[in-house]
Amino acid sequence: MSEVLGIIGEYNPFHNGHLYHIAKSKEESGAEFVICIISGNFVQRGDTSIVNKWAKAKMALANGADLVIELPTVYSISSAENFAQGAIKILNSLKIVDTISFGMETDDVAILNNIANVLYNEPKEYTTMLAHELKKGNSFPKARENALMMYLNDIKKYVNVLSGSNNILGIEYLKALKKTKSHMIPMGVKRQKVLYNDEYMVDEFASATSIRRMLKTREFDDIRRAMPKSSYQILGQELKQGHYVIDLSCFEKEIIYTLRKMSQEEIANLPDVSEGLDTSLKNAANSCNTLKELINIVKSKRFTQTRIQRILLYALLGIDKKQMDISKKINPYIRVLGFNAKGKQLISEMLRINPKLPVITSVKKYMDSLPNKNLKEMLNRDIFAGNVYTLGYEMDSWANLDYTNKIITM
């Protein structure tokens, strides 16, 4: 088979930067086929996806992807490390992907690889520095950044690298490739003109963060400029039908209710909860009226807002530490969201190489076949996440769309 490219993204929503990334990656790798792994209805920074996973799959297929696979929820709302490992495990399991491409703020993959080597090998000097930084009360990301800067001993070279959201994910992809002894070749594509959190446009480029802000203020002319025509049309259809969820605040009553209902022991059993955070969350839930108020009370130098939001999603979606631990030990299933003619070829080739590969094209058939217990529970979390997600719609808050929605074909 010709060269196959793997890309991991959230596409929340799919914009011109994503289009550039796919086109540039194909050009530089010489790939004929593109497989995209995308997060589903909830995303890595502990928030909702603006539109559902099928709409995002349509956007990707209309703009260069041949096969779109869902990253299971347990990975997609987790830390950068778990997010990357889940996606890399999926791509590895396909046994047909030659190159993995990711966006980055720097223009030098070697710099990211230097950092990934330290994180993978964990030399004693580095871990001692990390422990020291954590004792100062820093959040884990900040403590890790400080420890890496000291260990690598080249502030000028690395200071801006560790502040880039795409760089951080890129480092985790590289680390996951090493951890899984992957044969896939990594390549990076530098972001164009705007960074991940920039809230302004430059020419036809805007970050997904900026587009989501513009959606709240209904700046549709700028949104149209920042997205491929097909993506904008798909977004418009979803908005017109009331099938969108602006952000996590759409579920604030459900989240506060869930935390009030949970015992403190159950809260303590949520991933990322440690060091008395269970007490803070329980007390805040019992006294707060809004999600914003709850987050502002609980977040601190030690516990970032993103970490708090992830924990709130774990509570809302019923994901505990045991499920998270299992996800780190097993290979996920291959949940197909959509494909075109070339994508159909890819699926055939995957199954030719490994007929037992857990490829899901029908959720009902897969659940009825009594598969691996751990994979079944993981898929149940995806289904439940979808059932919760539609509660945020303005209209048609139907459950079980994972059973009724068809695979997107183009």
Stretches with model-predicted labels:
Residues 26-27, 61, 88, 92-93:
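Non-catalytic positions within long, well-ordered alpha-helices that form the structural scaffold/packing
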Residues 1-56:
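N-terminal catalytic cores of NTP/NDP-binding nucleotidyl/phosphoryl-transfer enzymes
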Residues 32, 66, 182-184:
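A structural micro-motif
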